[in-house]
């Protein structure tokens, strides 16, 4: 069942993306952020949930949920990133295309 949530997010299910953004597992939040960005999801509900994750420092493989959130907000044109964090810069540069 858990993998099906990620599959639903990948397939563009908005409800699954919202569920992923609210999920207790960092991998689900990170996937939801990445798929939101890839799919250009910029509706108010999703953007507000991504903004709330800018301070979420849980993560995997050296990247945090906040890295993903900050990069996504830049990619979506919501908040331009001007910092120096290399993880965030790499995510912005690749635009989450590794998830496609």
Describe each model-derived feature in a short phrase:
Residues 1-9, 26-41, 60-79:
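Structural detector for internal amphipathic alpha-helices that build alpha-solenoid repeat scaffolds
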Residues 7-21, 40-56, 78-87:
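Amphipathic alpha-helical scaffolding segments comprising HEAT/armadillo-like alpha-solenoid repeats
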Residues 70-100:
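Eukaryotic acidic, Ser/Thr-rich intrinsically disordered low-complexity regions
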Residues 24-25, 57-62, 93-96:
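Short inter-helical turns and helix N-cap capping residues of alpha-solenoid HEAT/ARM repeat scaffolds
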């Amino acid at each position: 069942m858990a993998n099906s949530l990620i599959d639903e997010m990948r397939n563009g299910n908005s409800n699954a993306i919202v569920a992923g953004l609210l999920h207790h597992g960092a991998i689900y939040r990170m996937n939801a952020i990445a798929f939101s960005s890839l799919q250009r999801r910029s509706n108010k509900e999703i953007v507000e949930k991504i903004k709330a994750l800018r301070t979420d420092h849980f993560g995997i493989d050296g990247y945090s949920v906040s890295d993903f959130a900050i990069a996504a907000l830049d990619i979506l044109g919501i908040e331009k990133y001007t910092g120096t964090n290399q993880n965030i810069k790499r995510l912005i540069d690749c635009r989450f295309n590794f998830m496609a």
